[in-house]
């Protein structure tokens, strides 16, 4: 079974994170390790998650010169992560170099995903960094660039999923943050949708954090979400 739920681990300590992880089941979700936890806890923490049979999405959003990003992606592959991402605005050459370095790994290579427009960003945010386009227009532009580079898919908000399916086809993976079960606080993300809605319009993987990690019974919430999208 291809788990569609990716739980974002946003904890301050290893003990807190592992306490949560030990309450959930790798058959029900994958786990995302971001910049804060990876900077604090490093590869040892990732290996602890893998030892518990969880697939890991290493969410470090690489953005640097091509060789530096490629070597970082290779290190992620050597670590055995399931998915790794980079910023599409790093350009075509950066993404192509990262994809090429994964070729020797074959079927064991992690999924390589492009980050398009962060879900916290709106039209004004883009304009302030010199991009005179809507989030939708910029996502489409960057998704095309990712596809041209040979990436496996992109991170995009739920509102862009249907358009990207049309532009990029059914085999291009769409990883969707901004997912909040009904009744949840939207937090710092503005372009949001429920799990059921996102799957129905074609999302492949749903990134969900606090509604699961801060729940009194995270396993029950996880089971409920999985049931809603079954």
UniProtKB/Swiss-Prot annotation:
Does the record's keyword annotation contain Transmembrane? no
- Residues given in the record as substrate binding sites: 10, 32, 59-68, 119, 180, 189, 209-210
- GO BP annotations listed: 'de novo' pyrimidine nucleobase biosynthetic process; 'de novo' UMP biosynthetic process
Q: Provide GO CC annotations from the record.
A: cytosol
| Pfam families given in the database record | OMPdecase
The active site of this protein is located at 61
Give the E.C. number(s).
4.1.1.23
* Catalytic reaction annotation: orotidine 5'-phosphate + H(+) = UMP + CO2
Please indicate if the UniProt record lists Cell membrane as a keyword: no
- Provide this UniProt record's keywords sorted from A to Z: Decarboxylase, Lyase, Pyrimidine biosynthesis
Residue ranges annotated as coiled coil are none
Task: Show the GO MF annotations.
Answer: orotidine-5'-phosphate decarboxylase activity
Q: Which PANTHER family match?
A: OROTIDINE 5'-PHOSPHATE DECARBOXYLASE
Report the HAMAP family cross-referenced here.
OMPdecase_type1_B
What the protein does?
Catalyzes the decarboxylation of orotidine 5'-monophosphate (OMP) to uridine 5'-monophosphate (UMP).
The record's note on quaternary structure and interaction partners says: Homodimer.
Homology family: Belongs to the OMP decarboxylase family. Type 1 subfamily.
**Name this polypeptide is given:** Orotidine 5'-phosphate decarboxylase
Q: From which organism does this entry originate?
A: Glaesserella parasuis serovar 5 (strain SH0165) (Haemophilus parasuis)
Q: Which gene encodes it?
A: pyrF
